Regions:
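Glycine-rich, acidic/polar active-site loops that bind/position phosphate-bearing ligands
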Residues: 1-325
């Protein structure tokens, strides 16, 4: 709420639309969750291949009865993976809706004898689950301030500055957008997860930030690294705080990258100044701990308590011996 007030004082309302991905797994004879899937459907498949279509429909209908407005619902790339997109709304309402959404999905899946998980990477060898965050700012007359029809890409100076702020601070806030040890198993090459700090308005899903093709009142930026394990209040506060910092300091984003970054060599990425996200929770914590920006954003109490909790989690993981080893 403190960060929302800062936006309000600058004349802005922060609007957000999340794309929530999750898996539906079978349960065993005791009702305990497994990682077994009951279908092998793929992106936008339909019945009879998408065997969970009725489950997803039941989830959507129940959410609509609860007052949610659902923008889209479809099968995702991995078997048993699904996406439900919530309608654009103010950030606080969206954060509340994400929390309610996750509880509702788990409850309704259980009615169908399935286990719903928002774990970022529950299975190796397939795509993980993210929660892309679409963002824009509106002025006091509810006009989208990211719009400038005179710009070649239709983006305003405020939009570029907001995006630049996120790109500039993303390493420091990654532990807020990707909070689990498991989050970083998703952020690896080869599974459509964004790991490179760049942006593009082309049909290119390798950069961290994508500018969807819709313009006018629908102009927005899409941050593609967050996953559904986030605390949405902290993650959205971090995104907004970074964006506002970009506006205040009139930051400029780097040149857009319209080529496929995944296929570039390390030398090509280095020459173009393309950096990457932290590769582990431990690395993300180090960047977070050294950030005065994040400490001022969250306040000392939340900043240090969050670090203590996540650092304990990281130390516990490091002491474990995995099956792979």
């Amino acid at each position: 709420k403190k960060i929302l007030k800062q936006a309000e004082d600058m004349g802005y309302t922060f609007l957000v639309g999340p794309e929530c991905e999750f898996f539906l797994f079978q349960t065993d004879e005791e009702g305990k969750p497994t990682t077994k899937t009951h279908e092998m459907a793929g992106y936008f498949d339909v019945s009879p291949i998408d065997m969970a279509e009725n489950v997803r429909r039941d989830i959507v209908l129940n959410l609509e009865e609860m007052g949610f407005v659902i923008d889209a619902s479809h099968h995702e790339i991995a078997p048993a993976q699904h996406e439900i997109d919530l309608q654009y709304a103010d950030a606080l309402s969206t954060a509340d809706n994400i929390m309610t959404f996750k509880m509702a999905v788990k409850t309704i899946a259980r009615r169908h004898g399935l286990h719903a998980t928002f774990m970022p990477k529950p299975k190796a060898g397939v795509n993980g689950s993210g929660m892309h965050i679409n963002m824009s700012l509106a002025d006091k007359d509810n006009r989208n301030v990211f719009v400038d029809e005179a710009d070649p890409l239709g983006l305003s100076r405020v939009a570029y500055q907001f995006m630049a702020g996120i790109l500039n601070h993303i390493k420091e806030i990654t532990v807020l957008t990707n909070p689990l040890v498991n989050s970083y198993k998703r952020l690896v090459p080869g599974y459509d997860a964004p790991i490179y700090i760049a942006w593009s308005a082309a049909s290119n899903r390798s950069p961290l930030i994508r500018i969807p093709s819709s313009r006018g009142s629908n102009t927005r930026i899409e941050l593609r690294c967050p996953d559904s394990a986030v605390n949405p209040y902290l993650a959205l506060a971090a995104c907004l705080g970074a964006g506002l910092d970009g506006i205040r300091n009139q930051m400029e984003p780097p040149v857009s990258v319209d080529d496929n970054i995944y296929t570039m060599t390390e030398e090509e990425r280095r020459q173009r100044g393309i950096q990457w996200l932290p590769e582990t929770l431990g690395e993300a914590l180090e960047l977070y701990a050294g950030s005065n920006f994040v400490r001022e954003l969250l306040g000392d109490h939340i900043f240090y308590k969050y670090f203590e909790a996540k650092n304990a989690e990281w130390k516990k993981f490091r002491a474990e011996v995995t099956d792979w080893e």
